Amino acid sequence: MALICIGSVCFSLFHIGVIILLIINYFSSHIKKIFPSFFKNPNKEEIDKHIGNILEAKRKNKQLEQSIYIELKNTGSLNQVFSSTQNSSIVIKFGAVWCKPCNKIKEYFKNQLNYYYVTLVDIDVDIHPKLNDQHNIKALPTFEFYFNLNNEWVLVHTVEGANQNDIEKAFQKYCLEKAK
């Protein structure tokens, strides 16, 4: 067994490897932000182009959808929202009552109903801790943009934080805009 000793303390290479993997896992989101070109999904551009084509076709054919805002309550199910919506886009906001940026951005989020045909879902992570864990939410608020591609809901974009410019760009890219 290979060991690395520092003074009177020795570590096996296996343990050092595990520690390095834990450190990389912990800092992975920061590393992805610093070096985004190394972590690009090669299909992301194709998916974005396909979504753009679908939205453009809906605009031309005037296939208008509905705008819905849902605040997921204790008994609410996110799966039920996905199965029942007629929209091609769903945007989920993960937040909390105690989160000031979440409360500040809430009206902006709701007002998107005036500009886009979209299903908006507001989830309080304190009421739905399982959803928080399932979606691996690390920051509040977090916005997840889903698009229905070939009858399958695909997570196409995530915005962490309350930056309205980033959120607006995602709405423009992944949601059907209402006529002005």
UniProtKB/Swiss-Prot annotation:
<keyword id="KW-0812">Transmembrane</keyword>
<dbReference type="Pfam" id="PF00085">
    <property type="entry name" value="Thioredoxin"/>
</dbReference>
<keyword id="KW-1133">Transmembrane helix</keyword>
<dbReference type="InterPro" id="IPR036249">
    <property type="entry name" value="Thioredoxin-like_sf"/>
</dbReference>
<comment type="function">
    <text>Participates in various redox reactions through the reversible oxidation of its active center dithiol to a disulfide and catalyzes dithiol-disulfide exchange reactions.</text>
</comment>
<keyword id="KW-0249">Electron transport</keyword>
<keyword id="KW-0256">Endoplasmic reticulum</keyword>
<dbReference type="GO" id="GO:0005783">
    <property type="term" value="C:endoplasmic reticulum"/>
</dbReference>
<keyword id="KW-1015">Disulfide bond</keyword>
<feature type="disulfide bond" description="Redox-active">
    <location>
        <begin position="99"/>
        <end position="102"/>
    </location>
</feature>
<feature type="transmembrane region" description="Helical; Signal-anchor for type II membrane protein">
    <location>
        <begin position="4"/>
        <end position="24"/>
    </location>
</feature>
<keyword id="KW-0472">Membrane</keyword>
<feature type="topological domain" description="Cytoplasmic">
    <location>
        <begin position="1"/>
        <end position="3"/>
    </location>
</feature>
<keyword id="KW-0813">Transport</keyword>
<feature type="active site" description="Nucleophile">
    <location>
        <position position="99"/>
    </location>
</feature>
<keyword id="KW-0676">Redox-active center</keyword>
<feature type="active site" description="Nucleophile">
    <location>
        <position position="102"/>
    </location>
</feature>
<feature type="topological domain" description="Lumenal">
    <location>
        <begin position="25"/>
        <end position="180"/>
    </location>
</feature>
<dbReference type="InterPro" id="IPR013766">
    <property type="entry name" value="Thioredoxin_domain"/>
</dbReference>
<feature type="domain" description="Thioredoxin">
    <location>
        <begin position="29"/>
        <end position="176"/>
    </location>
</feature>
<protein>
    <recommendedName>
        <fullName>Thioredoxin 3</fullName>
    </recommendedName>
</protein>
<keyword id="KW-0735">Signal-anchor</keyword>
<dbReference type="GO" id="GO:0005789">
    <property type="term" value="C:endoplasmic reticulum membrane"/>
</dbReference>
<comment type="similarity">
    <text>Belongs to the thioredoxin family.</text>
</comment>
